[in-house]
Protein backbone atom coordinates (compact mmCIF):
# COMPACT_ATOMS: atom_id res chain seq x y z
CA UNK A 1 0.00 0.00 0.00
CA UNK A 2 1.58 3.30 -1.08
CA UNK A 3 1.73 6.47 1.01
CA UNK A 4 -1.03 8.23 -0.94
CA UNK A 5 -3.54 5.47 -0.22
CA UNK A 6 -2.41 5.18 3.40
CA UNK A 7 -2.84 8.92 4.00
CA UNK A 8 -6.25 8.80 2.31
CA UNK A 9 -7.41 6.01 4.62
CA UNK A 10 -6.03 7.78 7.70
CA UNK A 11 -7.86 10.98 6.71
CA UNK A 12 -11.18 9.15 6.43
CA UNK A 13 -10.59 7.52 9.82
CA UNK A 14 -10.09 10.99 11.30
CA UNK A 15 -13.42 12.06 9.84
CA UNK A 16 -11.83 14.16 7.11
CA UNK A 17 -12.61 14.19 3.39
CA UNK A 18 -9.46 13.57 1.31
CA UNK A 19 -8.66 15.65 -1.75
CA UNK A 20 -10.56 14.38 -4.79
CA UNK A 21 -13.36 12.92 -2.64
CA UNK A 22 -16.77 14.09 -1.48
CA UNK A 23 -19.16 13.00 1.23
CA UNK A 24 -22.87 12.19 1.18
CA UNK A 25 -25.44 9.62 2.28
CA UNK A 26 -23.28 6.83 0.86
CA UNK A 27 -20.23 8.05 2.79
CA UNK A 28 -16.90 9.36 1.51
CA UNK A 29 -16.55 8.52 -2.19
CA UNK A 30 -14.40 9.59 -5.14
CA UNK A 31 -15.64 12.86 -6.61
CA UNK A 32 -16.10 11.24 -10.04
CA UNK A 33 -18.42 8.58 -8.59
CA UNK A 34 -22.11 9.27 -8.18
CA UNK A 35 -24.43 8.01 -5.46
CA UNK A 36 -28.01 6.99 -6.10
CA UNK A 37 -30.90 5.46 -4.16
CA UNK A 38 -31.52 1.81 -4.94
CA UNK A 39 -34.85 2.80 -6.51
CA UNK A 40 -32.99 4.67 -9.28
CA UNK A 41 -30.87 1.72 -10.37
CA UNK A 42 -33.30 -1.18 -9.91
CA UNK A 43 -36.77 -2.33 -10.89
CA UNK A 44 -39.19 -4.09 -8.55
CA UNK A 45 -40.16 -7.66 -9.49
CA UNK A 46 -43.87 -8.38 -9.14
CA UNK A 47 -44.30 -11.45 -11.38
CA UNK A 48 -46.10 -14.24 -9.49
CA UNK A 49 -45.60 -17.98 -9.85
CA UNK A 50 -49.27 -18.73 -10.49
CA UNK A 51 -49.64 -22.35 -11.59
CA UNK A 52 -46.09 -22.66 -12.97
CA UNK A 53 -43.99 -25.52 -11.59
CA UNK A 54 -40.92 -23.76 -10.17
CA UNK A 55 -38.50 -24.73 -7.42
CA UNK A 56 -39.37 -22.84 -4.24
CA UNK A 57 -36.51 -21.22 -2.36
CA UNK A 58 -36.02 -19.47 0.94
CA UNK A 59 -33.09 -17.47 2.31
CA UNK A 60 -30.94 -18.88 5.11
CA UNK A 61 -28.73 -16.35 6.90
CA UNK A 62 -25.07 -16.90 6.06
CA UNK A 63 -25.85 -19.44 3.33
CA UNK A 64 -28.10 -17.70 0.81
CA UNK A 65 -30.85 -19.35 -1.20
CA UNK A 66 -31.85 -22.85 -0.05
CA UNK A 67 -34.58 -25.22 -1.17
CA UNK A 68 -37.65 -24.37 0.90
CA UNK A 69 -38.83 -27.95 1.32
CA UNK A 70 -35.40 -28.98 2.61
CA UNK A 71 -35.32 -26.06 5.04
CA UNK A 72 -38.83 -26.41 6.45
CA UNK A 73 -39.54 -30.06 5.65
CA UNK A 74 -42.62 -29.34 3.56
CA UNK A 75 -43.83 -27.66 0.38
CA UNK A 76 -46.17 -24.69 0.51
CA UNK A 77 -49.83 -25.12 -0.39
CA UNK A 78 -50.94 -24.26 -3.92
CA UNK A 79 -52.75 -21.13 -2.78
CA UNK A 80 -49.67 -19.79 -1.02
CA UNK A 81 -47.33 -20.86 -3.82
CA UNK A 82 -49.32 -19.10 -6.54
CA UNK A 83 -48.46 -15.75 -4.94
CA UNK A 84 -44.74 -16.47 -4.75
CA UNK A 85 -42.47 -14.10 -6.67
CA UNK A 86 -40.59 -15.37 -9.73
CA UNK A 87 -36.84 -14.74 -9.74
CA UNK A 88 -34.45 -15.22 -12.64
CA UNK A 89 -30.67 -15.61 -12.58
CA UNK A 90 -29.11 -12.31 -11.54
CA UNK A 91 -32.18 -11.09 -9.63
CA UNK A 92 -32.09 -10.16 -5.93
CA UNK A 93 -34.30 -10.85 -2.91
CA UNK A 94 -34.17 -8.96 0.38
CA UNK A 95 -35.22 -10.91 3.47
CA UNK A 96 -36.53 -8.60 6.20
CA UNK A 97 -36.15 -11.30 8.82
CA UNK A 98 -33.46 -10.25 11.27
CA UNK A 99 -30.83 -12.60 12.66
CA UNK A 100 -27.74 -12.34 14.83
CA UNK A 101 -25.52 -12.30 11.74
CA UNK A 102 -27.81 -10.02 9.72
CA UNK A 103 -29.66 -7.70 12.15
CA UNK A 104 -30.75 -5.49 9.22
CA UNK A 105 -31.82 -8.44 7.08
CA UNK A 106 -29.90 -9.83 4.11
CA UNK A 107 -30.00 -9.47 0.34
CA UNK A 108 -29.12 -12.44 -1.89
CA UNK A 109 -28.56 -12.82 -5.62
CA UNK A 110 -29.95 -15.82 -7.52
CA UNK A 111 -26.88 -17.35 -9.18
CA UNK A 112 -27.08 -21.15 -9.18
CA UNK A 113 -30.50 -21.46 -10.85
CA UNK A 114 -32.01 -19.99 -14.00
CA UNK A 115 -35.42 -19.48 -12.40
CA UNK A 116 -37.13 -20.02 -9.04
CA UNK A 117 -40.03 -18.88 -6.86
CA UNK A 118 -39.57 -17.19 -3.48
CA UNK A 119 -42.04 -16.13 -0.74
CA UNK A 120 -43.74 -12.84 -1.51
CA UNK A 121 -42.65 -11.48 1.88
CA UNK A 122 -39.22 -11.02 0.28
CA UNK A 123 -38.64 -7.74 -1.51
CA UNK A 124 -37.44 -8.74 -4.99
CA UNK A 125 -35.71 -6.57 -7.55
CA UNK A 126 -33.27 -6.62 -10.44
CA UNK A 127 -30.53 -4.16 -11.28
CA UNK A 128 -31.63 -2.05 -14.24
CA UNK A 129 -28.57 0.21 -14.49
CA UNK A 130 -25.05 -1.11 -13.90
CA UNK A 131 -23.36 -4.43 -13.20
CA UNK A 132 -25.41 -6.74 -10.92
CA UNK A 133 -22.23 -8.50 -9.77
CA UNK A 134 -20.87 -5.21 -8.44
CA UNK A 135 -24.04 -4.57 -6.48
CA UNK A 136 -23.99 -8.12 -5.17
CA UNK A 137 -20.63 -7.36 -3.58
CA UNK A 138 -22.09 -4.21 -2.00
CA UNK A 139 -24.93 -6.22 -0.48
CA UNK A 140 -22.60 -8.99 0.73
CA UNK A 141 -20.39 -6.34 2.33
CA UNK A 142 -23.41 -4.96 4.17
CA UNK A 143 -22.93 -1.51 2.67
CA UNK A 144 -26.58 -0.56 3.33
CA UNK A 145 -26.64 -1.71 6.94
CA UNK A 146 -25.92 1.63 8.61
CA UNK A 147 -28.58 3.36 6.54
CA UNK A 148 -31.08 0.56 7.15
CA UNK A 149 -30.40 0.64 10.89
CA UNK A 150 -31.41 4.31 10.95
CA UNK A 151 -34.59 3.61 8.99
CA UNK A 152 -35.76 0.50 10.84
CA UNK A 153 -38.18 1.19 13.68
CA UNK A 154 -37.03 -0.59 16.83
CA UNK A 155 -38.26 -4.13 17.33
CA UNK A 156 -39.87 -6.56 14.95
CA UNK A 157 -43.44 -7.07 13.82
CA UNK A 158 -45.69 -9.88 14.98
CA UNK A 159 -44.62 -11.90 11.93
CA UNK A 160 -40.95 -11.62 12.94
CA UNK A 161 -40.01 -9.20 10.15
CA UNK A 162 -38.22 -5.88 10.58
CA UNK A 163 -40.26 -2.69 10.79
CA UNK A 164 -39.08 -1.36 7.44
CA UNK A 165 -41.23 -0.24 4.54
CA UNK A 166 -40.35 -1.05 0.94
CA UNK A 167 -40.03 2.68 0.27
CA UNK A 168 -37.47 2.98 3.06
CA UNK A 169 -35.54 0.00 1.71
CA UNK A 170 -35.35 1.40 -1.81
CA UNK A 171 -34.34 4.84 -0.53
CA UNK A 172 -30.97 3.57 0.68
CA UNK A 173 -28.18 5.27 -1.21
CA UNK A 174 -25.42 3.28 -2.94
CA UNK A 175 -22.09 4.29 -4.50
CA UNK A 176 -22.20 4.20 -8.30
CA UNK A 177 -18.77 4.13 -9.99
CA UNK A 178 -18.44 4.30 -13.79
CA UNK A 179 -19.59 1.01 -15.35
CA UNK A 180 -16.07 -0.09 -16.33
CA UNK A 181 -14.92 0.38 -12.75
CA UNK A 182 -17.95 -1.51 -11.43
CA UNK A 183 -17.06 -4.43 -13.67
CA UNK A 184 -13.39 -4.43 -12.64
CA UNK A 185 -14.25 -4.29 -8.92
CA UNK A 186 -16.72 -7.16 -9.36
CA UNK A 187 -14.14 -9.19 -11.28
CA UNK A 188 -11.49 -8.78 -8.57
CA UNK A 189 -13.82 -9.61 -5.69
CA UNK A 190 -15.46 -12.49 -7.58
CA UNK A 191 -12.00 -14.03 -8.03
CA UNK A 192 -11.64 -14.03 -4.25
CA UNK A 193 -15.09 -15.61 -3.96
CA UNK A 194 -13.96 -18.45 -6.22
CA UNK A 195 -10.77 -18.93 -4.20
CA UNK A 196 -12.81 -18.98 -0.98
CA UNK A 197 -15.27 -21.44 -2.49
CA UNK A 198 -12.50 -23.82 -3.58
CA UNK A 199 -10.72 -23.63 -0.23
CA UNK A 200 -14.00 -24.16 1.63
CA UNK A 201 -14.72 -27.18 -0.57
CA UNK A 202 -11.33 -28.65 0.33
CA UNK A 203 -11.93 -28.08 4.05
CA UNK A 204 -15.38 -29.69 3.77
CA UNK A 205 -13.93 -32.69 1.92
CA UNK A 206 -11.25 -33.18 4.58
CA UNK A 207 -13.86 -32.92 7.32
CA UNK A 208 -15.97 -35.50 5.51
CA UNK A 209 -12.93 -37.79 5.15
CA UNK A 210 -12.25 -37.46 8.87
CA UNK A 211 -15.86 -38.29 9.72
CA UNK A 212 -15.74 -41.39 7.53
CA UNK A 213 -12.42 -42.53 8.98
CA UNK A 214 -13.69 -42.10 12.54
CA UNK A 215 -16.38 -44.64 11.67
CA UNK A 216 -14.25 -47.10 9.72
CA UNK A 217 -11.07 -47.06 11.83
CA UNK A 218 -12.83 -47.87 15.12
CA UNK A 219 -14.83 -51.07 15.79
CA UNK A 220 -18.59 -50.84 15.61
CA UNK A 221 -20.67 -51.89 18.61
CA UNK A 222 -20.41 -55.67 19.06
CA UNK A 223 -17.24 -56.03 16.98
CA UNK A 224 -13.64 -56.39 18.17
CA UNK A 225 -12.02 -55.21 14.93
CA UNK A 226 -12.59 -52.09 12.80
CA UNK A 227 -13.89 -52.20 9.25
CA UNK A 228 -10.62 -50.78 7.89
CA UNK A 229 -7.13 -51.40 9.32
CA UNK A 230 -3.65 -50.28 8.48
CA UNK A 231 -1.37 -52.98 6.99
CA UNK A 232 0.34 -55.36 9.39
CA UNK A 233 -2.33 -55.46 12.10
CA UNK A 234 -4.72 -58.39 12.53
CA UNK A 235 -5.13 -58.95 16.29
CA UNK A 236 -8.54 -58.22 17.84
CA UNK A 237 -9.01 -55.07 19.89
CA UNK A 238 -9.63 -55.34 23.64
CA UNK A 239 -12.47 -53.42 25.25
CA UNK A 240 -11.38 -51.77 28.48
CA UNK A 241 -12.63 -49.01 30.72
CA UNK A 242 -10.61 -45.79 30.82
CA UNK A 243 -10.03 -46.12 34.56
CA UNK A 244 -8.27 -49.49 34.10
CA UNK A 245 -5.45 -48.20 31.91
CA UNK A 246 -4.83 -44.68 33.19
CA UNK A 247 -5.49 -42.29 36.06
CA UNK A 248 -8.52 -40.02 35.92
CA UNK A 249 -8.20 -36.91 38.09
CA UNK A 250 -9.53 -33.45 38.77
CA UNK A 251 -7.68 -30.28 39.66
CA UNK A 252 -8.01 -28.44 42.96
CA UNK A 253 -10.62 -25.70 43.17
CA UNK A 254 -9.72 -22.18 42.08
CA UNK A 255 -12.12 -19.42 43.09
CA UNK A 256 -13.06 -16.79 40.54
CA UNK A 257 -11.60 -14.00 42.64
CA UNK A 258 -8.24 -15.76 42.21
CA UNK A 259 -8.35 -15.41 38.42
CA UNK A 260 -5.87 -12.99 36.89
CA UNK A 261 -5.34 -11.31 33.51
CA UNK A 262 -1.83 -12.76 33.20
CA UNK A 263 0.29 -15.51 34.69
CA UNK A 264 -0.30 -19.26 34.30
CA UNK A 265 -3.09 -20.14 31.81
CA UNK A 266 -6.22 -21.40 33.59
CA UNK A 267 -8.29 -23.65 31.34
CA UNK A 268 -12.07 -23.92 31.62
CA UNK A 269 -14.49 -25.92 29.50
CA UNK A 270 -14.99 -22.88 27.23
CA UNK A 271 -11.25 -22.85 26.48
CA UNK A 272 -11.28 -26.53 25.52
CA UNK A 273 -14.36 -26.12 23.31
CA UNK A 274 -12.81 -23.06 21.62
CA UNK A 275 -9.53 -24.90 21.03
CA UNK A 276 -11.44 -27.87 19.58
CA UNK A 277 -13.33 -25.59 17.18
CA UNK A 278 -10.28 -23.48 16.35
CA UNK A 279 -11.92 -20.36 17.79
CA UNK A 280 -10.50 -17.63 20.00
CA UNK A 281 -11.61 -17.37 23.61
CA UNK A 282 -11.02 -14.77 26.30
CA UNK A 283 -8.38 -16.42 28.45
CA UNK A 284 -8.14 -16.59 32.24
CA UNK A 285 -4.98 -16.95 34.31
CA UNK A 286 -3.84 -17.60 37.86
CA UNK A 287 -0.73 -16.33 39.59
CA UNK A 288 2.47 -18.36 39.45
CA UNK A 289 2.49 -18.47 43.25
CA UNK A 290 -1.01 -19.98 43.41
CA UNK A 291 -0.13 -22.46 40.65
CA UNK A 292 2.95 -23.71 42.51
CA UNK A 293 0.89 -24.12 45.68
CA UNK A 294 -1.91 -26.02 43.90
CA UNK A 295 0.32 -28.50 42.04
CA UNK A 296 1.84 -29.65 45.34
CA UNK A 297 -1.40 -31.51 46.03
CA UNK A 298 -2.97 -32.03 42.58
CA UNK A 299 0.11 -32.58 40.43
CA UNK A 300 1.14 -30.94 37.15
CA UNK A 301 -0.47 -31.27 33.76
CA UNK A 302 2.07 -32.78 31.36
CA UNK A 303 2.45 -33.07 27.62
CA UNK A 304 -0.02 -35.63 26.17
CA UNK A 305 -2.33 -35.54 29.18
CA UNK A 306 -5.95 -35.13 28.03
CA UNK A 307 -8.52 -32.71 29.41
CA UNK A 308 -12.14 -33.54 28.62
CA UNK A 309 -15.11 -31.33 29.35
CA UNK A 310 -17.36 -32.48 32.18
CA UNK A 311 -19.86 -29.62 32.04
CA UNK A 312 -21.48 -27.50 29.35
CA UNK A 313 -20.63 -29.08 25.99
CA UNK A 314 -19.58 -32.37 27.55
CA UNK A 315 -17.04 -34.86 26.25
CA UNK A 316 -14.92 -32.42 24.21
CA UNK A 317 -11.21 -33.41 24.42
CA UNK A 318 -7.98 -31.42 24.47
CA UNK A 319 -4.42 -32.78 24.37
CA UNK A 320 -1.94 -30.82 26.48
CA UNK A 321 0.64 -29.78 23.84
CA UNK A 322 3.72 -29.21 26.03
CA UNK A 323 5.05 -29.14 29.58
CA UNK A 324 4.58 -25.42 30.12
CA UNK A 325 2.59 -24.49 33.26
CA UNK A 326 -1.17 -24.95 32.78
CA UNK A 327 -3.96 -25.41 35.28
CA UNK A 328 -7.57 -26.48 34.81
CA UNK A 329 -10.91 -25.80 36.45
CA UNK A 330 -11.94 -28.62 38.78
CA UNK A 331 -15.48 -29.81 37.90
CA UNK A 332 -15.38 -28.25 34.43
CA UNK A 333 -12.58 -30.45 33.11
CA UNK A 334 -11.70 -34.07 33.78
CA UNK A 335 -7.99 -34.83 33.66
CA UNK A 336 -6.88 -38.07 31.97
CA UNK A 337 -3.21 -38.80 32.58
CA UNK A 338 -0.96 -40.19 29.88
CA UNK A 339 0.19 -43.76 30.53
CA UNK A 340 2.23 -46.56 29.00
CA UNK A 341 -0.96 -48.49 28.20
CA UNK A 342 -2.46 -46.01 25.76
CA UNK A 343 -1.46 -43.47 23.11
CA UNK A 344 -2.99 -40.07 23.81
CA UNK A 345 -3.50 -39.20 20.14
CA UNK A 346 -5.46 -42.44 19.70
CA UNK A 347 -7.63 -41.76 22.75
CA UNK A 348 -8.22 -38.19 21.60
CA UNK A 349 -9.38 -39.49 18.21
CA UNK A 350 -11.76 -41.91 19.90
CA UNK A 351 -13.23 -39.06 21.96
CA UNK A 352 -14.13 -37.31 18.69
CA UNK A 353 -15.80 -40.37 17.13
CA UNK A 354 -19.53 -40.81 16.58
CA UNK A 355 -19.45 -43.97 18.68
CA UNK A 356 -18.24 -42.02 21.70
CA UNK A 357 -20.77 -39.22 21.11
CA UNK A 358 -23.58 -41.79 21.08
CA UNK A 359 -22.25 -43.42 24.23
CA UNK A 360 -21.92 -40.18 26.17
CA UNK A 361 -25.37 -38.96 25.18
CA UNK A 362 -26.79 -42.09 26.77
CA UNK A 363 -24.98 -41.90 30.12
CA UNK A 364 -24.62 -38.20 30.94
CA UNK A 365 -26.84 -36.69 33.62
CA UNK A 366 -29.08 -34.44 31.56
CA UNK A 367 -31.37 -32.02 33.34
CA UNK A 368 -31.06 -28.31 32.88
CA UNK A 369 -27.30 -28.97 32.61
CA UNK A 370 -25.48 -32.04 31.28
CA UNK A 371 -22.56 -33.52 33.24
CA UNK A 372 -19.82 -36.05 32.56
CA UNK A 373 -18.27 -37.01 35.89
CA UNK A 374 -14.93 -38.49 36.92
CA UNK A 375 -16.56 -41.83 37.70
CA UNK A 376 -18.31 -41.85 34.32
CA UNK A 377 -15.01 -41.14 32.57
CA UNK A 378 -13.39 -44.01 34.47
CA UNK A 379 -16.24 -46.33 33.41
CA UNK A 380 -16.18 -45.26 29.75
CA UNK A 381 -15.45 -48.31 27.54
CA UNK A 382 -12.77 -47.97 24.88
CA UNK A 383 -11.66 -50.61 22.36
CA UNK A 384 -7.86 -50.68 22.48
CA UNK A 385 -5.54 -52.30 19.93
CA UNK A 386 -1.84 -52.82 20.54
CA UNK A 387 0.28 -49.76 21.35
CA UNK A 388 1.81 -50.02 17.88
CA UNK A 389 -1.59 -49.89 16.18
CA UNK A 390 -2.75 -47.12 18.52
CA UNK A 391 0.30 -45.11 17.44
CA UNK A 392 -0.47 -45.56 13.74
CA UNK A 393 -4.16 -44.69 14.12
CA UNK A 394 -3.42 -41.77 16.44
CA UNK A 395 -0.75 -40.37 14.12
CA UNK A 396 -3.10 -40.62 11.13
CA UNK A 397 -5.79 -38.55 12.84
CA UNK A 398 -3.24 -36.13 14.26
CA UNK A 399 -1.85 -35.41 10.78
CA UNK A 400 -5.35 -35.16 9.34
CA UNK A 401 -6.34 -32.65 12.05
CA UNK A 402 -3.21 -30.61 11.32
CA UNK A 403 -4.04 -30.61 7.61
CA UNK A 404 -7.61 -29.46 8.28
CA UNK A 405 -6.34 -26.71 10.60
CA UNK A 406 -3.82 -25.56 7.98
CA UNK A 407 -6.43 -25.25 5.24
CA UNK A 408 -8.95 -23.68 7.64
CA UNK A 409 -6.42 -20.96 8.51
CA UNK A 410 -5.64 -20.41 4.84
CA UNK A 411 -9.39 -20.07 4.20
CA UNK A 412 -9.74 -17.53 7.00
CA UNK A 413 -6.76 -15.57 5.65
CA UNK A 414 -8.36 -15.32 2.18
CA UNK A 415 -11.68 -14.32 3.75
CA UNK A 416 -10.00 -11.58 5.78
CA UNK A 417 -8.10 -10.32 2.74
CA UNK A 418 -11.32 -10.14 0.73
CA UNK A 419 -13.06 -8.32 3.58
CA UNK A 420 -10.29 -5.71 3.65
CA UNK A 421 -10.37 -5.34 -0.14
CA UNK A 422 -14.13 -4.84 -0.12
CA UNK A 423 -13.76 -2.01 2.37
CA UNK A 424 -11.21 -0.31 0.12
CA UNK A 425 -12.59 -1.02 -3.36
CA UNK A 426 -16.30 -0.50 -2.68
CA UNK A 427 -15.64 2.93 -1.18
CA UNK A 428 -13.12 3.97 -3.82
CA UNK A 429 -10.35 4.49 -1.26
CA UNK A 430 -8.34 2.27 -3.59
CA UNK A 431 -9.05 2.79 -7.27
CA UNK A 432 -8.77 0.08 -9.91
CA UNK A 433 -7.20 0.56 -13.31
CA UNK A 434 -9.69 0.19 -16.15
Can you describe what each PLM-predicted range is?
Residues 1-22:
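Accessory (non-catalytic) regions of SAM-dependent nucleic-acid methyltransferases
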Residues 3, 23-29, 173-220, 226-243, ...:
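A structural feature that tracks compact, well-ordered secondary-structure segments
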Residues 18, 42-78, 110-111, 117, ...:
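DNA target-recognition patches
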Residues 18-20, 115-121, 154-180, 310, ...:
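A short glycine-rich beta-alpha junction/loop motif
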Residues 19-49, 229-251:
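Non-catalytic DNA-recognition/assembly elements of restriction-modification systems
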Residues 23, 75-81, 158, 190, ...:
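Short, solvent-exposed loop/turn positions at domain surfaces
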Residues 85-144, 157-158, 268-270, 285-352:
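A short beta-sheet element
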Amino acid sequence: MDDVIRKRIEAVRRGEVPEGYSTGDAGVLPADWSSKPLSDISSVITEQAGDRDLETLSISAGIGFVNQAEKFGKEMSGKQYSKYTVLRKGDFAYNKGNSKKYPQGCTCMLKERDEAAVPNVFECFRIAVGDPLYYEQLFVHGFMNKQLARKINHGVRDDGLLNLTNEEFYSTVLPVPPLAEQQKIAKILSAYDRAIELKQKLVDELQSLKKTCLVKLFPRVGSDVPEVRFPGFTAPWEQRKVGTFTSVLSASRVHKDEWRTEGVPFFRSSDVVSAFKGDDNERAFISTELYEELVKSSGRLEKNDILITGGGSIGIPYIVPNNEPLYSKDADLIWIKKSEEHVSQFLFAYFTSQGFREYISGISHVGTIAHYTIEQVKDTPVSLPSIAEQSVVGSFFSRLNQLITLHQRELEAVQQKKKALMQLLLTGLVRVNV
